[in-house]
UniProtKB/Swiss-Prot annotation:
S-adenosyl-L-methionine binds at residues 185, 213, 218, 234, 294. The gene is trmA. Transmembrane segments: none annotated. Keywords: Methyltransferase, S-adenosyl-L-methionine, Transferase, tRNA processing. Its EC number is 2.1.1.-, 2.1.1.35. It holds the Pfam family tRNA_U5-meth_tr. One of its GO terms (biological process) is tRNA methylation. This is tRNA/tmRNA (uracil-C(5))-methyltransferase. It is an enzyme of class 2 (transferase). The keyword S-adenosyl-L-methionine applies. The active site is at 319 (nucleophile), 353 (proton acceptor). GO terms for cellular component: cytosol. InterPro entries: MeTrfase_TrmA_AS, MeTrfase_TrmA_CS, SAM-dependent_MTases_sf, TrmA_MeTrfase, U5_MeTrfase_fam.
Amino acid sequence: MSLPHFDPSHYDAQLADKQARLSGLLAPFAAPEPEVFDSPREHYRLRAEFRLWREGEARHYAMFDPGDKRKPILLDDFPIASERINDLMPRLKAAWENAALGFKLFQVEFLTTLAGDALITLCYHRPLDTFWQTAAERLAAELGVSIVGRSRGQRLVVGRDYVEEELEVAGRRFRYRQPEGAFTQPNGVVCRKMLNWAHDVLGERDDDLLELYCGNGNFTLPLATRVRRVLATEISKTSVNAALTNLESNGVDNVTLVRLSAEELTQALNEVRPFRRLAGVDLKGYDFGSLFVDPPRAGMDPDTCELARRFGRILYISCNPETLAANIARLHDTHRVVRCALFDQFPYTHHMESGVLLERR
């Protein structure tokens, strides 16, 4: 993980630059000006990863400058991380003086939530034994966290291997299980704004929604309340299991979740070939009015873009505005951008999250 150049006095100017950049990318499509959703200036990041760096007999949390990956920047705190992470950092540093915990420890990962949950992953260049287990159990109790120990071919869990989050969308609180090692949105406050925007933009519908790349159900849960039924796809087994748990714990019963990639579902809808994982799913029985996509940085592949043309409405959340613009260019002859938004998930970096609603011309 690289260290962002943190300076709250520059935040507003950086956000304005991102807005101008997004507006410029979407200008060829006559898009409206983006709605802008800012971030807290500090303590916004709910997860963080640090290497450990030795200087003499002492070891420190370390990150690296994006311009020089070989030179560490030693840290005692991390202002962009959540207050919970900053509280845990010195207490964990004191604990790794215990040889059972500190011997050949080379990396530490923190995962926290707005709801107050926390999990620490400790990564080692050695096998973990019963002495480690005993020390980790004691530390977990002292810190009020779960701990996962990792070494090659080994993963030991003290407590739980997930955290629990609660996010309010349109007045309803949704509970999310977020597994260790799986993707979650790092900026919880901005994630909540994204969910509320998407819920508002989708609107109340009397037809069905197809969702690609659903992850742990982050968007699935609130969007399912706006439509008749949802067919959602995700390729990661860990994320699928978390999504199924999240659907059940929130009482959302109008979602069918299948473990397929977007490319595979496209083949299924085009009747290129059958998939065993779709056994019992009547694809032709759905009345899809909207498509929701939240693809990886590469955006939608050409076949998925062609699939998207079939939908009257496309709600697209993007972590890469360049591939978003490229995908819109493919769809521009059939769809127009009617709403767009900038979500500042990653302050003090050039990265941005954005969203658009496209409607058929």
